[in-house]
């Protein structure tokens, strides 16, 4: 794993040293277009995931279903360190909420901003309302916006509490929610594991796009988060089977038509 992460850091260095300056010049001449950096990131992510697969560490099957065609808020569970990379690779024109601490440590702040990503609040220079406004702006520009309701990786073999932020974002933006379910067995570097201790054997990852959902009505975001969390727990086998209280057509608008 040390060698692999060395390659990962080398890729970041080359992106900062070569790719970012080239795209900066192109953006100065032709005008800024986040899709250029997103396209570059998707290529680099694809190479990294191919390397993990080739080393017998992590592999993923073909996703089940398709994401909603237009602007939406994408929400998901987060069982492992790299599941988000599959989503970045497979879902085009998607902005992502990125931990500001991670962006500073690598350092990738200019790359993420160039790609149209939004940095998470640090409660010092950036508050949650500023991040919310930036996310709404991205959605109104035509992007899908990806965020994790747990706000961090899931506990090993479990699921964290869903917060209401993503569902408030969907309501304020007046766009559908696109829930997707990630099953990772065994979890590849979950929250409790050290990055230098990969799981024994191949970790397999499956992604399932659920039916899009209309956003909650005003004041119902917390209840919506609680109910959707229960649905994920049921899918993970963490609670007794029960009928979900969530329906694709419940909300404050017309039921969105899912992509086929």
What name fits each language-model region?
Residues 1-61, 110-111:
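A transmembrane-helix-recognition feature enriched in membrane-embedded lipid enzymes
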Residues 3-8, 44-98:
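Conserved H-X4-D acyltransferase segment
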Residues 49, 87, 109, 135-136, ...:
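Short amphipathic alpha-helical segments and helix-helix/interface helices
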Residues 129-260:
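Non-catalytic C-terminal accessory region of glycerolipid acyltransferases
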């Amino acid at each position: 794993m040390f060698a692999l992460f060395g390659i990962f850091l080398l890729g970041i260095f080359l992106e900062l040293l070569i790719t970012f300056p080239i795209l900066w010049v192109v953006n100065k001449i032709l005008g800024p277009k986040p899709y250029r950096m997103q396209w570059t990131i998707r290529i680099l992510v694809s190479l990294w995931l191919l390397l993990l697969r080739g080393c017998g560490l992590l592999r993923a099957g073909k996703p089940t279903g398709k994401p909603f065609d237009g602007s939406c808020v994408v929400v998901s569970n987060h069982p492992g360190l790299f599941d988000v990379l599959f989503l970045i690779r497979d879902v085009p024109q998607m902005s992502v909420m990125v931990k500001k601490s991670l962006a500073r440590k690598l350092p990738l702040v200019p790359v993420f901003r160039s790609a149209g990503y939004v940095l998470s609040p640090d409660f010092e220079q950036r508050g949650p309302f500023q991040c919310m406004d930036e996310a709404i702006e991205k959605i109104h520009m035509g992007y899908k916006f990806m965020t994790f309701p747990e706000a961090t990786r899931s506990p090993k073999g479990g699921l964290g509490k869903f917060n209401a932020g993503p569902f408030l974002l969907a309501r304020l933006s007046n766009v559908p929610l696109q829930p997707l379910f990630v099953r990772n067995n065994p979890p590849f570097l979950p929250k409790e594991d050290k990055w230098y201790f990969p799981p024994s054997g191949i970790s397999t990852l499956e992604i399932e796009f659920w039916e899009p959902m209309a956003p909650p009505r005003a004041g119902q975001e917390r209840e919506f988060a609680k109910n959707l969390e229960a649905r994920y727990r049921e899918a993970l086998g963490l609670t007794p089977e029960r009928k979900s209280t969530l329906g694709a057509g419940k909300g404050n608008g017309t039921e969105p038509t899912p992509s086929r």
